[in-house]
């Protein structure tokens, strides 16, 4: 009887304990929720003085106003910056997250020069499934250590080794374009993009994927689809939760694309690492290093051998993060810059003639590949590229997560705010670029750029987290453009308003870049 009574008491104690635990968990959840709401309310109140767009609602902010279509969304943001150009900054709420848009050189400088405000926006977390915590997405000590390790791999003497690859792929591109000479206008955007993809694959991984010959490869499709899905998800707060995202068809497609991308990169890394180990074994037993004697060096080879201050090498996962980052950042941005350059040159024949004359001066009638010395002499072409990136920056906006409260133009910007720098608007400030919509490469002549605010032009970002690969990008852009322009005369077939600007992760023309080609004949010019 006593045993039965004790059993009943024990059962009641268990039930009471479970109920108490549930009550405690529920109370903790409610308390946590109340704390979040209170924190949100404080932020809302404290940031009230910052100029803002009308019709922001609690919790959802301006999210309901945001256009879902990439083209309409970008146009909406640019219209806001034009409307509020007289204001030093502009506040937007994306769900419960406050954002301040910066398009004024003095205020952009505050964020980009700070050694404390180096954390990338929380929105970059949507890149992490693909890129991990590589140079683009990492923060704090990991970023500092990784940046220090990788900076030597972008030294110009190393970049020179990649010029042969750039020349070879540019010549393949020219052969592909030959069929369009004296034909109807065609969309050149994808041609250029595939060329840039071939270049970054071979320079980053030592792998020639032949994208220009096989544009339907599984890897190529996955690269483009992944970029589209990431941008779409960033704009839609209701897709931010991973478990919820996987309930949609796009979430499963994201997972499948991710598997394709990582499988490819992992296999290339393993293959390259095995080759390096085999060569080391050969050297160890006196057989030399013949297997890799004629193999071109790639960024991957440098990553496999680079060490930190303590002599530690990167892990396989670390290397994959950086290779995937090179792939993501290294082809779309460059391809966009080249496409926009072709559009602007085709729309401004007087500028194209000046480039023509410079090419004649440097190359004459020779069809030899460009050398490093040739590229250094193409100063006017470099000004064309700079002016192109002013009008159409490859990355039209990027963000930092404010890691501690700061002051911008007299306004208090709170920790946790997303500071969004908008180069597309920044580069159109008439104080620094009179007649900002006009294409004038001469703006970047040294005498004309003198005295311009150093943060009025940031196509590669600026400060501690500037683009580590900008020299590589400019080298590739000059190589491909000079190769195209030595063979063809470009005519654009679109007006500016017909381009349909789409500011995804990269600034693209939603309607493509349509041009006509004529064979260039130096004797007639």
Curated annotation (Swiss-Prot):
GO terms for MF: heme binding; iron ion binding; long-chain fatty acid omega-hydroxylase activity; oxidoreductase activity, acting on paired donors, with incorporation or reduction of molecular oxygen, NAD(P)H as one donor, and incorporation of one atom of oxygen
Tissue and organ distribution: Broadly expressed. Detected in heart, brain, placenta, lung, liver, skeletal muscle, kidney, pancreas, retina, retinal pigment epithelium (RPE) and lymphocytes.
UniProt: heme binding residues: 329, 467
Protein name: Cytochrome P450 4V2
Species annotation: Homo sapiens (Human)
Keywords, ordered alphabetically: Corneal dystrophy, Disease variant, Endoplasmic reticulum, Heme, Iron, Lipid metabolism, Membrane, Metal-binding, Monooxygenase, NADP, Oxidoreductase, Sensory transduction, Transmembrane, Transmembrane helix, Vision
The organism's taxonomic lineage, starting at the top: Eukaryota, Metazoa, Chordata, Craniata, Vertebrata
Stored Gene3D superfamilies: Cytochrome P450
Catalytic activity: dodecanoate + reduced [NADPH--hemoprotein reductase] + O2 = 12-hydroxydodecanoate + oxidized [NADPH--hemoprotein reductase] + H2O + H(+); tetradecanoate + reduced [NADPH--hemoprotein reductase] + O2 = 14-hydroxytetradecanoate + oxidized [NADPH--hemoprotein reductase] + H2O + H(+); hexadecanoate + reduced [NADPH--hemoprotein reductase] + O2 = 16-hydroxyhexadecanoate + oxidized [NADPH--hemoprotein reductase] + H2O + H(+); (5Z,8Z,11Z,14Z,17Z)-eicosapentaenoate + reduced [NADPH--hemoprotein reductase] + O2 = 20-hydroxy-(5Z,8Z,11Z,14Z,17Z)-eicosapentaenoate + oxidized [NADPH--hemoprotein reductase] + H2O + H(+)
């Amino acid at each position: 009887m006593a045993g039965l009574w004790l059993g009943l008491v024990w059962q009641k104690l268990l039930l009471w304990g479970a109920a108490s635990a549930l009550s405690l968990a529920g109370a903790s959840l409610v308390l946590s929720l109340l704390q979040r709401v209170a924190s949100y309310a404080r932020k809302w109140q404290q940031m009230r003085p910052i100029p803002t767009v009308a019709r922001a609602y609690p919790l959802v902010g301006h999210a309901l106003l945001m256009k879902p279509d990439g083209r309409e969304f970008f146009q909406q943001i640019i219209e806001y910056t034009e409307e509020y150009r007289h204001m030093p900054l502009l506040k937007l709420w994306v769900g419960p997250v406050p954002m301040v848009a910066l398009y004024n050189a003095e205020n952009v400088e505050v964020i980009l020069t700070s050694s404390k405000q180096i954390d990338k926006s929380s929105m970059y977390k949507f890149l992490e499934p693909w890129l991990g915590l590589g140079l683009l997405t990492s923060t704090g000590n990991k970023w500092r250590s990784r940046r220090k390790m990788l900076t030597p791999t972008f030294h110009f003497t190393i970049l020179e080794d990649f010029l042969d690859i750039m020349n070879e792929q540019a010549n393949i591109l020219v052969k592909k374009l030959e069929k369009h000479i004296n034909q109807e206008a065609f969309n050149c955007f994808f041609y250029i993009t595939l060329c840039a993809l071939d270049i970054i694959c071979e320079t980053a991984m030592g792998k020639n994927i032949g994208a220009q010959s096989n544009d339907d490869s599984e890897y190529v499709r996955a690269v483009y689809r992944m970029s589209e899905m990431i941008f779409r998800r960033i704009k839609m707060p209701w897709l931010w939760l991973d478990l919820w995202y996987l309930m949609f068809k796009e979430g499963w497609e994201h997972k499948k694309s991710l598997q394709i991308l990582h499988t490819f990169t992992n296999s290339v890394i393993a293959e390259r690492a095995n080759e390096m180990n085999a060569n080391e074994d050969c050297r160890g037993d006196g057989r030399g290093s013949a297997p890799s004697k004629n193999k071109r060096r790639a960024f991957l080879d440098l990553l496999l051998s680079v060490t930190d201050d303590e002599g530690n090498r990167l892990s396989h996962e670390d290397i994959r993060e950086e290779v995937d980052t090179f792939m993501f950042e290294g082809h779309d941005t460059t391809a966009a810059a080249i496409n926009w350059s072709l559009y602007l040159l085709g729309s401004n024949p007087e500028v194209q003639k000046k480039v023509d004359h410079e090419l004649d001066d440097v190359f004459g009638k020779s069809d030899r590949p460009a050398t490093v010395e040739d590229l250094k002499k193409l100063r006017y072409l470099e000004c064309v590229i700079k002016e192109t990136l002013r009008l159409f920056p490859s990355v039209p906006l990027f963000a930092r997560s404010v890691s501690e409260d700061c002051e911008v133009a007299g306004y208090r910007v709170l920790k946790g705010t997303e500071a969004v720098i908008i180069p597309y608007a920044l580069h159109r400030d008439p104080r620094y670029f009179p007649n900002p919509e006009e294409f004038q490469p001469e703006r970047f002549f040294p005498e004309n750029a003198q005295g311009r605010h150093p943060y009025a032009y940031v196509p590669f970002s600026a400060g501690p987290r500037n683009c580590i690969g900008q020299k590589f990008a400019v080298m590739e852009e000059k190589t491909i453009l000079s190769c195209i322009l030595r063979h063809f005369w470009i005519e654009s077939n679109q007006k500016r308003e017909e381009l349909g600007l789409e500011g995804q992760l990269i600034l693209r023309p939603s309607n493509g870049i349509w041009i006509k080609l004529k064979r260039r004949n130096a004797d007639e010019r």
